[in-house]
UniProtKB/Swiss-Prot annotation:
Protein's name according to its UniProt entry: Urease accessory protein UreF
One Gene Ontology term of the molecular function aspect: nickel cation binding
Principal location listed in the UniProt entry: cytoplasm
GO cellular component assignments: cytoplasm
Origin species: Staphylococcus epidermidis (strain ATCC 35984 / DSM 28319 / BCRC 17069 / CCUG 31568 / BM 3577 / RP62A)
Gene from which this protein is expressed: ureF
Compartmental location: Cytoplasm
Annotated family: Belongs to the UreF family.
Cross-referenced Pfam families: UreF
Record flagged with keyword Cytoplasm: yes
Entry keyword Zinc: no
Amino acid sequence: MIDHQHLRLFQFCDSQFPTGAFSHSFGLETYIQRETVHDTETFIKWLHLFINEQLTYSDGIAMRIVYHALINNDKDKILDINQKLFVQNLPKETRIGAKQMGTRMVKLALDLYDSEWIQWYYNQMKNNKIKLHPAVCFTMLGHFLGVDVESIIDYYLYQNISSLTQNAVRAIPLGQTAGQQVVTEMIAHIEKTRHHILELDEIDFGMTAPGLELNQMEHENVHVRIFIS
């Protein structure tokens, strides 16, 4: 039987879902312009690097922390990790991009569901206390829908893989079939990544590969571009 609650969360994983993810490459465009990423093989290497070295240690750990804070009704912990998500994101374009995507996701979630936690989260932003982040909103939505933390993380990883692959299809460019082959290969990597996220300590939060951040920063100086970040 189909689990409709999981499907409701998976709706937010659609690469065409209007959060603005299609406008952000998170530094990939810099690698493409340098021809470091130029085909399916080199894109997969970059995608592994992004998922393993940046997303895992920022969004991934934060989602686990937020989920348990929701269970324990710990608002201070949510505000703390949300602030850390924002300040540890040093590249300006990716920091602003995450804020914009988080704001759009929260507004869409509130249009579709009556979640007290997401409404509280949105109110914190309206009161100028925080910036909104998609990883926090996605976790709150999954919790509201009764989805387990393991599945929430899996879906979020898939959403990032899918949207970045569609962006690579446009930018490198790759064929649509090649893009689907990338997603198929990366799906096998999701479970391993989630296990790693669940095993990490909170002190590991914020670790990332300097090369990724440098290329995200250097994207600010790219004059001919497809993406905002």
